[in-house]
């Protein structure tokens, strides 16, 4: 949502080599209310609770039913990515190139520069992610940087300095470029790095296409009628990141968890992060005419769009926010269970980023739910403390 002034650099600094990114649904399971029932099983057939606010406000809701259309659509992608990873692991080896060596472009030294620049961009825009990649193997680290840069550039299309010029056609062109790079025909050096990454790791193109789809939504959609609609949006712009990065970060060889369950946890982390982003930015978004909150849940809480634009913290608002925060925390909890199944070097950065983001929810509470005019943030001391604590926890999990 926010844009960055140095973003233009992502578009201009790159020399052109040719000369010129279920249902976890967290099973959104009211475990605090359904004591004595089976623990959460990721990807079961139980329907996620679409309105966690209900969990706060009302009696237990029976949630066992079929997946919604949004959940089905997302679940398909999870299954597809999990299958790709399993196939790569069992048949070809996770490090084998996707297409025949002779078809691949020989980027030679350029590729080294391309990855290096991706690292610089990641370091500049996302210091914590960057720091987190330092323990990974060089191959994995470079690959996460390349994915990061592609995601950042995609977001900058609709949120950056040139966003007013972005049309659905421009996003179609960006998607064509994505297809090209997946087929070994990168357009610029950042694309070349990602092209190399997807040739080495079993990364499916669908989450990348879906992130572009999320950006398409941002071009015309500024209201979400239900959590189901919002869930799909969060999957598009953030859940996808989990599906893109786990094939690179790797699942622990001794993990007994199913590939699919680890992917569901990764998806949960993206959703949790985006729900947190949304709750933090309610005021900022409303000033841009946007409301990324489920309108039906707002109405159930006795709140209207006008209440959001007015931006007054009332008891109704506090109650509504408590429900939204609870839901985001459930997604974080779901994600946290998956961390232990990642390759050991990847656990620390993921846990650290999870804790840092989750603390934003604590900050919203500390601000007495005033997310209209106060920006919730995690102070530097807390940030710094999270890193060694996450490191110690991740080490214990190995
Ligand atoms: C098993 C398990 C738990 C695995 C973990 C899997 C994993 C690493 C998941 C990553 C989840 C994650 C970091 C999601 C990103 C969510 C996010 C911040 C999305 C942002 C979307 C739109 O935001 P908006 O415009 O509303 O807000 P801004 O004001 O613009 O911030 C994004 C901006 C989309 C673009 C996403 C990125 C640029 C971040 C991509 C990050 C990576 C590829 C690095 C992940 C690596 C590590 C080490 C955690
Ligand atoms: Mn953005």
Curated annotation (Swiss-Prot):
Membrane-related topology note: Peripheral membrane protein
Localization annotation: Plastid, Chloroplast membrane; Plastid, Chloroplast, Plastoglobule
Single GO BP term: carotenoid biosynthetic process
Chain segment of the transit peptide: 1-80
Catalytic reaction(s) noted: 2 (2E,6E,10E)-geranylgeranyl diphosphate = 15-cis-phytoene + 2 diphosphate
Keywords: Carotenoid biosynthesis, Chloroplast, Isoprene biosynthesis, Membrane, Plastid, Transferase, Transit peptide
Spans through the membrane: none
A GO MF label: 15-cis-phytoene synthase activity
Highest taxon listed in the record's lineage: Eukaryota
Tissue-level expression: Expressed in leaves and endosperm. Expressed in developing leaves.
The EC number(s) this enzyme carries: 2.5.1.32
Enzyme class: transferase
A Gene Ontology term for the protein's cellular component: chloroplast membrane
Primary location recorded for the protein, binned into one broad class: plastid
Induction description: Induced by salt stress and abscisic acid (ABA) in roots.
CDD domains assigned: Trans_IPPS_HH
Pfam families assigned: SQS_PSY
Family: Belongs to the phytoene/squalene synthase family.
Physiological role: Catalyzes the conversion of geranylgeranyl diphosphate to phytoene. Mediates the first committed step in carotenoid biosynthesis.
Name assigned to this protein: Phytoene synthase 2, chloroplastic
């Amino acid at each position: 949502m926010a844009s960055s002034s140095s973003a233009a650099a992502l578009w201009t600094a790159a020399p052109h080599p040719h000369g010129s990114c279920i249902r976890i649904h967290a099973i959104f399971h009211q475990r605090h209310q359904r004591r004595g029932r089976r623990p959460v099983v990721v990807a079961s057939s139980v329907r996620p609770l679409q309105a966690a606010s209900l969990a706060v406000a009302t009696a237990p809701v029976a949630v066992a039913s079929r997946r919604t259309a949004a959940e089905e659509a997302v679940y398909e992608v999870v299954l597809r990515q999990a299958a790709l990873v399993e196939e790569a692991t069992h048949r070809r080896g996770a490090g084998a190139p996707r297409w025949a060596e002779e078809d691949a472009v020989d980027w030679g030294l350029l590729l080294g520069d391309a990855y290096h620049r991706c690292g610089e961009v990641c370091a500049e825009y996302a210091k914590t992610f960057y720091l987190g990649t330092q323990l990974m193997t060089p191959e994995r680290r470079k690959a996460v940087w390349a994915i990061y840069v592609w995601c950042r550039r995609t977001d900058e299309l609709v949120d950056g300095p040139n966003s007013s010029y972005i049309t659905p056609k421009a996003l179609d062109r960006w998607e064509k470029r994505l297809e090209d790079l997946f087929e070994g025909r990168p357009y610029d050096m950042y694309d070349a790095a990602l092209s190399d990454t997807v040739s080495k790791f079993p990364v499916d193109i669908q989450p990348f296409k879906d992130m572009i789809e999320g950006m398409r939504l941002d071009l015309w959609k500024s209201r979400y009628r239900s959590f189901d609609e919002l869930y799909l949006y969060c999957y598009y712009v953030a859940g996808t990141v989990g599906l893109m990065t786990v094939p690179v970060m790797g699942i622990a060889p001794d993990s007994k968890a199913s590939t699919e369950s680890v992917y569901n946890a990764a998806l949960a982390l993206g959703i949790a992060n985006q729900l947190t982003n949304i709750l933090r930015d309610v005021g900022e978004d409303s000033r841009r005419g946007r409301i990324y909150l489920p309108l039906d849940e707002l109405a159930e809480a006795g709140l209207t769009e006008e209440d959001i634009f007015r931006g007054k913290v009332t008891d109704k608002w506090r109650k509504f926010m408590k429900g939204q925060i609870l839901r985001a925390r459930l997604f974080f909890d779901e994600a946290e269970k998956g961390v232990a199944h990642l390759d050991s070097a990847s656990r620390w950065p993921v846990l650290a980023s999870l804790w840092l983001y989750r603390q934003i929810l604590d900050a919203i509470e500390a601000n007495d739910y005033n997310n209209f005019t106060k920006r919730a943030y995690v102070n530097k001391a807390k940030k710094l403390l999270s890193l060694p604590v996450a490191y110690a926890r991740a080490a214990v999990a190995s």
